[in-house]
Amino acid sequence: MIQRFRFGLPLPTDSVVQEIPVSAGPVPFLTAEEDGWAYRMAPDAIVYGLGEMPRGINKRGWHYETNNTDESEHGENRLSYYAAHNFLLISPADGSECIGIFIDFPGKVSYDIGYTRHDTLRFATAEPNYALYLITAPTAAEVAKRFRQLIGPSYIPPKWAFGLAQSRFGYKTEADIREVAAQYKANGLPLDMICMDIEYMQDYADFTVNKERFPDLTKLSADLKAQGIRLVPIIDA
């Protein structure tokens, strides 16, 4: 079962592809608080989700933020990394019904997943304009399946994207890229793609190319492709 609740005037994000009617009744499972929501967790419940985040697969016992911002340092004590995936899956150890929580909101969301109180999950959005989806199912796998149906299937990457990639920060010139390809070939190593970080840009601005250091990015890409190597420039957005 999927229920949708709307608060304020949510900004359209196109994150959801299914038409789910807005539920008028009270929000089940959750308790409204002054700045968000609380959920009472079973003692051995496991909490999955939030995408690429610090710590382990079970998110219980820490607090997090999702805000789509650069994080220059990675470590166990960080509150977030780059991306925002505002989906939680709560799986009770006793085999009772599993619950999925999806917050459709493009801004900052804060989570306290058993950090302040081991038995309490709390979350709050920076603004009171968002859509909240609750998904219930007998198993965690079924919750995940229904969530995927809600947001639509992922794109299918090209076959070469499953190959070997050489990626690092610090390739400053076209010559650096060509040298990487040459050294792989000289050492008899397979190479399917070279990923470039922000050094190829003009003043680190998206959708720009530093013409002094990369005078002809189109030709560089074509030359590498002729060798069976794809050039993958980062878009730091």
Language-model-detected regions and their locations in the chain:
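Aromatic-lined carbohydrate-binding/catalytic grooves of carbohydrate-active enzymes
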Residues: 155-237
